[in-house]
Design a protein with these regions (language model features):
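Active-site acidic-Proline motif in GNAT/NAT acetyltransferases
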Residues: 109-111, 115, 143-144
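Conserved active-site alpha-helix within GNAT-family acetyltransferase domains
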Residues: 119, 143-161, 166-168
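Conserved GNAT acetyl-CoA-binding A-motif
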Residues: 122, 130-140
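Conserved acetyl-CoA pyrophosphate-binding loop and the N-cap/start of the following alpha-helix
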Residues: 112, 116-124
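Acetyl-CoA-dependent GNAT
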Residues: 1-55, 68-105, 109, 122, ...
């Protein structure tokens, strides 16, 4: 079941963010992500969780979009803890000037991946964005994250720009 998160779930969001980055960069310290959550997480940046529904073995059906309720169902395994997270913010298209959804984080716990949960969450947020009048959705993904790149490509996402970084040394 997809459940709309609350701004009271800041610490759980932080745990999921840290897991996201630790999966990709296991030797790094991500304590600074607390500041990111503190700065950007609000009622204007919705959060959704994927959780079990009902008794063990009970499964829902696939669904899409908010449509005024807080729950959407689709088959997922039993779990005591959320098994996936989707956090969305707002951005302005710098070419056209239109507001649009921007995905901050999509994370599925490793043992629940490749079961359609990420795809279902992406379709869910696409429908949510359409309902609020958005014409596009943006996100950033690390080039080294091949599974995520494959998912986004399969869903029709295209590269619009490249984020380029140059590491600077304090020594000369």
């Amino acid at each position: 079941m997809i459940r709309r998160g609350s701004t009271l779930e800041r610490s759980l969001l932080l745990k999921f963010m840290q897991r996201t980055y630790q999966d990709l960069f296991p030797n790094e310290d991500f304590s600074h992500l607390e500041q990111t959550v503190k700065q950007y997480f609000s009622s204007d940046t919705p959060l959704w969780w994927v959780e079990e529904e009902g008794e063990q073995g009970d499964k829902g059906t696939r669904g899409q979009g908010d449509k005024g309720n807080n729950y959407t169902q689709f088959p997922i395994p039993n779990s005591q803890f959320p098994i996936a997270c989707l956090w969305v913010g707002n951005a302005i298209d710098q070419v056209q000037g239109n507001r649009h959804a921007h995905i901050f984080i999509l994370y599925v716990v490793p043992e629940h991946r490749r079961r359609g949960i990420g795809t279902a969450l992406m379709r869910y947020v696409e429908n949510w964005a359409i309902q609020r009048g958005d014409r596009q959705i943006g996100l950033q993904v690390f080039q080294s994250n091949k599974p995520a790149l494959n998912l986004y490509n399969q869903l029709g996402y295209q590269t619009q720009s490249l984020w380029m970084v140059k590491f600077l040394s304090a020594e000369k």
